Amino acid sequence: MTIMRKTHPLMKLVNHAFIDLPAPSNISGWWNFGSLLGMCLIIQITSGLFLAMHYTPDTLTAFSSVTHICRDVNYGWLIRYIHANGASLFFICLYLHIGRGIYYGSYSYMETWNIGIILLFLTMATAFMGYVLPWGQMSFWGATVITNLLSAIPYIGTDLVEWIWGGFSVDKATLNRFFAFHFILPFIIAAMAMVHLLFLHETGSNNPLGIPSDCDKIPFHPYYTTKDFLGIVLLLTFFLILVLFFPDLLGDPDNYSPANPLNTPPHIKPEWYFLFAYAILRSIPNKLGGVIALILSILILALLPHIQTASQRSLMFRPISQFLFWLLVSDVLILTWIGGQPVEPPFIIIGQIASLSYFTIILALMPIAGIIENKMLKW
């Protein structure tokens, strides 16, 4: 008798994606982040759904409704902190996943990589809109500052900003539409993640050596299901410690004050996971130039397959490129730190040097290193 998972139309899909999928025998723990991101998305959609049952997207009651969730709803405080810190967990996994892709040359699978970049943009948009919903001080001013950046677009900028706001300032209409978009986008992300997987399974997974692994494949289940489960248990342990012991560690104290359009916080900044891009934005004195640099800081990932010069795919045996990769990681961490600092010396110049280094490493130094390594290996 044929096994049902191999014949049933629906189970056949699951079987080909998660059970009988041929996977390279040597992929390391760095390949766990795909499943961890899936888990984060499920956590966020579930906790968000329960929060939406009690939240009211109205400027007069939004802040109070979040307070009500924390004080009066059974385990509301837990759901709220799971959702708030779940976003941080999502971005930690996302950045590690992208770092893995750069290190091991996974960007060679261009369709998968480009869908991944779209997923990153969608996730950033969702997180930004979610940050506005509690209607605290940083929610309001963050929304005002970031949406106002669109006014730098020539000719249509001002009209575009007023169209997004639904008026002449961030107000009830803005909050309402941000709630609607914040609710629908995670489902679009889930659909795009399916497309991401579809393209990945067309080519098969990359591996640490960066060489074809068709001659040595093993079934995904039980080997990698077990491995993924271990990763999920470890990550959930870390996550629950964060939620239950340090729930406000990654948040901003200003967001515990209700939004007040008449009182500007001394230092407006986004959540920690956007600080690197915010630092790049601030490092350019011109408004339009800053917006372009901000977009390019993410869009530059799409150039990686086109500026790859090395004959080897992975950085595993390329010491110069390895050094540059870790220099890039350090640079992003410095940018994250600078983004959280006030705009004053010496932070301004540090931010400008770090921003210039970010683009120089990716656009110039890494391709040059690839050529040098080819010469060293006589390829």
UniProtKB/Swiss-Prot annotation:
It is a multi-pass membrane protein. A ubiquinone binds at H201. It comes from the Eukaryota. Its main location: mitochondrion. Its cofactor is heme b. GO terms for molecular function: metal ion binding; ubiquinol-cytochrome-c reductase activity. It is found in: Mitochondrion inner membrane. GO terms for cellular component: mitochondrial inner membrane; respiratory chain complex III. InterPro entries: Cyt_b/b6_C, Cyt_b/b6_C_sf, Cyt_b/b6_N, Cytb/b6-like_sf, Cytochrome_b, Cytochrome_b_C_euk/bac, Cytochrome_b_N_euk/bac, Di-haem_cyt_TM. Gene3D superfamilies: Cytochrome Bc1 Complex, Chain C. Heme b b566 binds at H97, H196. Belongs to the cytochrome b family. Heme 1 (or BL or b562) is low-potential and absorbs at about 562 nm, and heme 2 (or BH or b566) is high-potential and absorbs at about 566 nm. The cytochrome bc1 complex contains 11 subunits: 3 respiratory subunits (MT-CYB, CYC1 and UQCRFS1), 2 core proteins (UQCRC1 and UQCRC2) and 6 low-molecular weight proteins (UQCRH/QCR6, UQCRB/QCR7, UQCRQ/QCR8, UQCR10/QCR9, UQCR11/QCR10 and a cleavage product of UQCRFS1). This cytochrome bc1 complex then forms a dimer. This is Cytochrome b. It comes from Dipodomys spectabilis (Banner-tailed kangaroo rat). The lineage of its organism: Eukaryota, Metazoa, Chordata, Craniata, Vertebrata.
